[in-house]
Amino acid sequence: MSFYNHKEIEPKWQGYWAEHHTFKTGTDASKPKFYALDMFPYPSGAGLHVGHPEGYTATDILSRYKRAQGYNVLHPMGWDAFGLPAEQYAMDTGNDPAEFTAENIANFKRQINALGFSYDWDREVNTTDPNYYKWTQWIFTKLYEKGLAYEAEVPVNWVEELGTAIANEEVLPDGTSERGGYPVVRKPMRQWMLKITAYAERLLNDLDELDWSESIKDMQRNWIGKSTGANVTFKVKGTDKEFTVFTTRPDTLFGATFTVLAPEHELVDAITSSEQAEAVADYKHQASLKSDLVRTDLAKEKTGVWTGAYAINPVNGKEMPIWIADYVLASYGTGAVMAVPAHDQRDWEFAKQFDLPIVEVLEGGNVEEAAYTEDGLHVNSDFLDGLNKEDAIAKIVAYLEEKGCGQEKVTYRLRDWLFSRQRYWGEPIPIIHWEDGTSTAVPETELPLVLPVTKDIRPSGTGESPLANLTDWLEVTREDGVKGRRETNTMPQWAGSSWYYLRYIDPHNTEKLADEDLLKQWLPVDIYVGGAEHAVLHLLYARFWHKFLYDLGVVPTKEPFQKLFNQGMILGTSYRDHRGALVTTDKVEKRDGSFFHVETGEELEQAPAKMSKSLKNVVNPDDVVEQYGADTLRVYEMFMGPLDASIAWSEEGLEGSRKFLDRVYRLITSKEILAENNGALDKAYNETVKAVTEQIESLKFNTAIAQLMVFVNAANKEDKLYIDYAKGFIQLIAPFAPHLAEELWQTVAETGESISYVAWPTWDESKLVEDEIEIVVQIKGKVRAKLMVAKDLSREELQEIALADEKVKAEIDGKEIVKVISVPNKLVNIVVK
């Protein structure tokens, strides 16, 4: 057989690995550790697509490489299995979401195993397993005990069709829900919040210690959004009311000519005049129908309504009209802003639209034409005139503090985490509300609080979750006869994924979240690979919970993930007609290298696009494995380009990777293997070992594979292959194409053992040195020959070799040699006449 028979070889080795528990996590405490973590998937009904294995293959290469280097390797997989899609499916079909989820997990697991990943399945976790979410609930009770989990009446993004509130991040720019595209309205509801803001400074500062890309760190820094400035208190004219504004530029107070409150601000109704009441009420209603993203869009037309009230500017006593406008959010800052239209473009546009005064307080621009947003010396600012920004801020803050109408303040863009969902398919929040007005956490001895099985998982209609319909579960009575009601909100999908990497370390522990000694052994995670779409929320939430657990003494490290890597996206192919309209792939045929619409015959333009069901361009890994084999898929996805690049899927590239593996198979099975080294491949082999080792370490898998190809080309030029080089090469390719490597290993090693723990090959630095070098031979300054000669020959030896060359002899035949100039390792120049 002169080709790699993947249909026979791959299932054979997958069966071997499963039977022998080949990838069981090592426990030898004398060995170094390596913890390689994938972002665990949500097991959807669609199964894996070819984008999933890209990151999984990367961590698998590292895991196999580290095992061969003698590390204990923890390389686990599990399921982020709570969430809306399963619940939506259950409501649509009447089936139990647990059954749907179990079927999907079985399918995902089958697909993952078919790709030959070296997971330790003894450590599999599932966020919907009560033995797992017992500890999710335990973490919540600890947060509650420390005052970091609390209830609040907050405006939420309510989606009537989904029957739940959703997070800001789940609202699309057009004001509809990410899931389903339903209308989103703002309405106040009782919600559970987690006080992530208490950790804002630590979440910000500790980023500096992490081996993450600067772009991801910057996204987190921007999300946390630290601002230093001042709180300024404004009194409302003719009342005893006042409100506070946070500003990063208190030095521009003399230019503040009006103030703007969020429509939801608590003062609005109290200060609105009777003449303006109807307009204000109407505006508040309109604002409630818009998402925060829509409201704060810089490009949208400015809208607002005057309340009829005035604020008093604390530095000059001037009256400032108080407006409401939807671009101010109640959830951000204090829900109120002081408007300085001369030096803020949004305020300037608002002032122009509603004919409000514009007062310049920083020199350098023409504020009649546009807001001047650069720095300049202060003008029209009384005791700040002539000062620069830093000096003016210091002086105005001192003035405000002395007068009792302001103080220095640090704020964060980060808001507390809205932690409740009005859905069934999530972890029950372990809290009981008693009729005497108190609330208590469910005792640890009664955890897990198990999600009751029910077919009635429609939204309750009251804004509560479907759990409110289950009175047997809902209603409880204390020993003293006091009646209570369980919390009906469930946790968001983020909960189970905020700590799963800890449970992998000790997944069967019934006494605690995980054993302290094991946590010390394995933390932090050495490398975490996943999509950049989780750059902010999941990573921020996991870091928050980890820091909280660190404060409790549960985990030994301040940070969970030492190194983070975001793989790129594998794009599909799209086709467009002359109008630019997309054509689904089932309506496209290929002829003579071009693409045509099967119905109209029109030639189409091909371009990369995100894989989607609607375009029918999703590639299923099952089909690839069936036709080409898992090792081909693995090698192709790693060879496509840099791991962090987004690259289009190519059938031709897949075929190229398959041909390479066939060449590898033929090289080892057809070439004569020698016990003695003839030295012919010394340099090529040692270069390959060094390059592949270094490139795996730096996650440059595409260049590592390119180097393996270089070696195959070099080896194919030789008649025979040295046994140690054959073995070493098989070890080098094993992390990329493990099934092929296992099969070939059996042909060169007599042990019958798996290649998985055979020591990684080393290289001989002395064999990397060039022992030959190319020199040029010039005659009268023109290059006439290029010769390969031994390195470091003397001038005399070089001259002798050059003059003996047949080509050179022909050139100088019949001519007199005047002089020969030899430069070792470079050239020989012959002067003739």
UniProtKB/Swiss-Prot annotation:
Its EC number is 6.1.1.4. One of its GO terms (molecular function) is aminoacyl-tRNA deacylase activity. A motif ('HIGH' region) lies at residues 41-52. PROSITE patterns: AA_TRNA_LIGASE_I (PS00178). Keywords: Aminoacyl-tRNA synthetase, ATP-binding, Cytoplasm, Ligase, Nucleotide-binding, Protein biosynthesis. GO terms for biological process: leucyl-tRNA aminoacylation. Transmembrane segments: none annotated. CDD domains: Anticodon_Ia_Leu_BEm (cd07958), LeuRS_core (cd00812). GO terms for cellular component: cytosol. It is found in: Cytoplasm. SUPFAM superfamilies: Anticodon-binding domain of a subclass of class I aminoacyl-tRNA synthetases (SSF47323), Nucleotidylyl transferase (SSF52374), ValRS/IleRS/LeuRS editing domain (SSF50677). InterPro entries: aa-tRNA-synth_I_CS, aa-tRNA-synth_Ia, Leu-tRNA-ligase, Leu_tRNA-synth_edit, M/V/L/I-tRNA-synth_anticd-bd, Methionyl/Leucyl_tRNA_Synth, Rossmann-like_a/b/a_fold, tRNAsynth_Ia_anticodon-bd. It holds the Pfam family tRNA-synt_1g. It is an enzyme of class 6 (ligase). It catalyses: tRNA(Leu) + L-leucine + ATP = L-leucyl-tRNA(Leu) + AMP + diphosphate. The keyword Nucleotide-binding applies. A motif ('KMSKS' region) lies at residues 610-614. ATP binds at residue 613. PANTHER family: LEUCINE--TRNA LIGASE, MITOCHONDRIAL, LEUCYL-TRNA SYNTHETASE. Belongs to the class-I aminoacyl-tRNA synthetase family. NCBIfam families: leuS_bact (TIGR00396). This is Leucine--tRNA ligase. It comes from Streptococcus pneumoniae (strain Taiwan19F-14). The gene is leuS.
